[in-house]
UniProtKB/Swiss-Prot annotation:
<dbReference type="GO" id="GO:0003735">
    <property type="term" value="F:structural constituent of ribosome"/>
</dbReference>
<dbReference type="InterPro" id="IPR001593">
    <property type="entry name" value="Ribosomal_eS1"/>
</dbReference>
<dbReference type="Pfam" id="PF01015">
    <property type="entry name" value="Ribosomal_S3Ae"/>
</dbReference>
<dbReference type="InterPro" id="IPR018281">
    <property type="entry name" value="Ribosomal_eS1_CS"/>
</dbReference>
<keyword id="KW-0687">Ribonucleoprotein</keyword>
<protein>
    <recommendedName>
        <fullName>Small ribosomal subunit protein eS1</fullName>
    </recommendedName>
</protein>
<comment type="similarity">
    <text>Belongs to the eukaryotic ribosomal protein eS1 family.</text>
</comment>
<dbReference type="GO" id="GO:0006412">
    <property type="term" value="P:translation"/>
</dbReference>
<dbReference type="GO" id="GO:1990904">
    <property type="term" value="C:ribonucleoprotein complex"/>
</dbReference>
<dbReference type="InterPro" id="IPR030838">
    <property type="entry name" value="Ribosomal_eS1_arc"/>
</dbReference>
<keyword id="KW-0689">Ribosomal protein</keyword>
<dbReference type="GO" id="GO:0005840">
    <property type="term" value="C:ribosome"/>
</dbReference>
Amino acid sequence: MARMKARSAKGKRVAKDTWKSKVWYDIYTPQSFGGDVIGQTPANDPATLIGRISEISLRDLTNEHSKHMTRMYFKVDGVSGNNATSQFVGHDTTREYLKSQVRRRRSKINAIVDVRTKDGFKLRVKALVLTAVRARDHHKTEIRVKMEQIIKDMAKETAFAEFVHAMLMGGLGSKIYGDCKKMFPLKRVEIFKSEVLEFGKVVEAPVEEAAVEAPVEEAAETQE
C-alpha cells in the first residue's frame, strides 16, 4: 500500500502557472492625445495584444473633474518591447449622467450622423440637445437638421485629431448650442457617443518603432 501511494504521488502532474510567465505591457495613447500611459495589460505573446481595447475616463486623461462622465476607448495597434501603441476608437457617456440631465417639461432631441474628416476618418457621432421648454415637432425637426449639418461641416473642415478634441472638450457642442439657440431656447448639448468606423491616414510618432502592427482599416465597436 505504501508503494502504491508513493507511486501515485510521483506520477501526479503539477499545473503550470501561466500567469507568472506573462509579461506586462504599458499602453500608450496616440501622440495626438499626449502619448501618455493609460494602463497596463499582461500577455504571453505580444501579438495577442493587437486589437485589445483599453478604457479610460476623460477626467483621468485630462485631469478635468467635470469630464468624469465621459469614457474613452483606445485599441492596441502595435507593440515594441514592453510598450503598446493604440488608436482612439470612440467614446461614450455614462447612462446615469444622461438620465440626470433629462427633466420634465423639456424636449430631448437626438441626432445620429456618419461623417468623414478632412484626413479620411469616418465616424458615427451621436448628439443630444435638451431644450429649456417643451418643443413642438416642427421645432425638433429644424433643430435636428441644424445639428446634423453642423456636425458634418465641422468634420469635413477638420482633421481627425482636431475633430475628436472638439467632440470631447466642448467645441462641437458649443457650436451646436450657439447656432440652435437662435432657433429655440436650449438648456444643454451633449456629444454623448462616437465610434470610429474607418481609419484614415495619420502620422504618429510611436513610443518605439513598432515590432508588431495591426491593420488600420477597421475599428472595434465600443459598447453601448
